[in-house]
Curated annotation (Swiss-Prot):
The complex is composed of two ATP-binding proteins (MetN), two transmembrane proteins (MetI) and a solute-binding protein (MetQ). It is found in: Cell inner membrane. The gene is metN2. Part of the ABC transporter complex MetNIQ involved in methionine import. Responsible for energy coupling to the transport system. Its EC number is 7.4.2.11. The keyword Cytoplasm does not apply. This is Methionine import ATP-binding protein MetN 2.
Length: 335
C-alpha cells in the first residue's frame, strides 16, 4: 500500500517558493492500477518522483508497505528503489547496447546475480513482453512499441512490487498504445504488481485503471473508481478530460439540440443494464416517445457502459423519469 499523508512539495526558484504539490493525502491499495491524470504542470510527475523518492517532500509522510520512506537513509533508499520499477515516455534505452543488455543492466548494476542467472532472467522477461526473438537487436532496429516493451522488461528485471509509468504511451500510435496497455494489464493481473501511471489521456485511464485521481494546479480535484469518475464527473477539469475523450463539445451539442422538441436527457448505463431493452419498455409503460440524438457503447476496463442522449416527447414524463431511476440508470436532464 502507498499512502500520502498531507504531502506537499515546494521548489525554491530565484528566491521564491514555487508550490509543485499542495498538501495531498492519497491511498493506493496493493495490486491496484492507479491513474494520475492532469495537464502539464498539474503536479502528477512530482507525485511519481515522490513515490520513488527521487524527490524529497517538503512536508508530510509517504508510507509504503507500512514504512515511512521519507525517513530512509541512503542505504534504505537504494534497497527500496530496487522494489520500484520505472517506465519512461521516451524509453531511455542505451543505443549502444542490445535489447538483452538493456534489460540486464539493472541486474548487472545490483551485482547480486551471476551472469548465468542474469541471462536466464532476461530470457524470461523478453518472453513475457513478446520480444524473445529480438534479444540481439539494438534499439535503432525496433519500433516504438517494441522499445517500450524493452523498457517494461527492464523495469521488471529486479522483481519490483511497484511499477511507475511516466506517460508510457504518449509517444505511441493508438494501436501500439492499446497493445502496451494490454501488456500492462496482464502484468498487473499475473504478477499482482501495484501500477501507478500518469497520463493526460482519459482513454488510457479508462482502458487499464481501477482508480483515478484528477490533478490540476498541484491539487487532486477529484478521485475515485474510474467508472464513477468517468461517467459522473463533478469537477470542471474532469469534465473537460471526459469531453476530450468522447470528442464532444457540450456547448456545440446543446446548440445542435436547440430546435429539437421535447425534454432532452442523457442516460448512463453500466454493466448488464447496458444491453437491457429499457427504452422500449419505458415507452410502452409510459407512452413517452423518444428519439436518439447521440450515443455510444464502450468499456471501462472490463465493465461495459453506454450513454444515450434522448429527446422525450408526450406521455407521462415523470413516470418515465421514475422508471429510469428505478432501473439504476443515471439520468441527467439537459433541458
Amino acid at each position: 500500500m502507498i499512502e500520502f499523508q498531507n504531502v506537499h512539495k515546494t521548489y525554491r526558484v530565484d528566491g521564491r517558493d514555487i508550490p509543485a504539490l499542495n498538501p495531498t493525502s492519497l491511498t493506493i491499495e496493493d495490486g491496484q492500477v492507479f491513474g494520475l491524470i492532469g495537464h502539464s504542470g498539474a503536479g502528477k510527475s512530482t507525485m511519481l518522483r515522490l513515490i520513488n523518492r527521487l524527490e524529497a517532500p517538503s512536508g508530510g509522510k509517504i508510507i509504503v508497505d507500512g514504512e515511512d520512506v521519507t525517513a530512509f537513509d541512503a542505504n534504505q533508499l537504494r534497497r527500496f528503489r530496487q522494489q520500484v520499477g520505472m517506465i519512461f515516455q521516451h524509453f531511455n534505452l542505451l543505443a549502444s547496447k542490445t535489447v538483452a543488455d538493456n534489460v540486464a543492466l539493472p541486474l548487472v548494476l545490483a551485482g547480486e546475480l551471476s551472469r548465468g542467472e542474469i541471462d536466464k532472467r532476461v530470457t524470461e522477461l523478453l518472453a513475457r513482453v513478446g520480444l524473445q526473438d529480438h534479444a540481439r537487436k539494438y534499439p535503432a532496429q525496433l519500433s516504438g512499441g517494441q522499445k517500450q516493451r524493452v523498457g517494461i522488461a527492464r523495469a521488471l528485471s529486479t522483481n519490483p512490487k511497484i511499477l511507475l509509468c511516466d506517460e508510457a504511451t504518449s509517444a505511441l500510435d493508438p494501436q501500439t498504445t492499446a497493445s502496451v496497455l494490454q501488456l500492462l494489464a496482464e502484468i498487473n493481473r499475473e504478477l499482482k504488481l501495484t501500477i501507478v501511471l500518469i497520463t493526460h489521456e482519459m482513454d488510457v485511464i479508462r482502458r487499464v485503471c481501477d482508480r483515478v485521481a484528477v490533478m490540476d494546479a498541484g491539487k487532486i480535484v477529484e478521485q475515485g473508481p474510474v467508472a464513477e469518475v468517468f461517467l459522473h464527473p463533478e469537477h470542471p477539469t474532469t469534465k473537460r478530460f471526459v469531453q476530450e475523450d468522447e470528442q464532444v463539445d457540450e456547448g456545440e451539442q446543446r446548440d445542435d439540440f436547440a430546435h429539437v422538441p421535447g425534454r432532452i436527457v442523457r442516460l448512463t448505463f453500466q454493466g448488464d443494464a447496458t444491453y437491457a431493452p429499457l427504452l422500449g419498455t419505458v415507452a410502452r409503460e409510459t407512452g413517452v416517445d423518444y428519439s436518439i440524438l447521440a450515443g455510444r457503447i464502450d468499456r471501462i476496463k472490463d465493465v461495459p457502459y453506454g450513454q444515450l442522449t434522448l429527446a422525450l416527447i408526450g406521455g407521462d414524463m415523470e413516470a418515465a423519469f421514475a422508471r429510469f431511476k428505478a432501473a439504476d440508470v443515471h439520468m441527467e436532464v439537459l433541458r
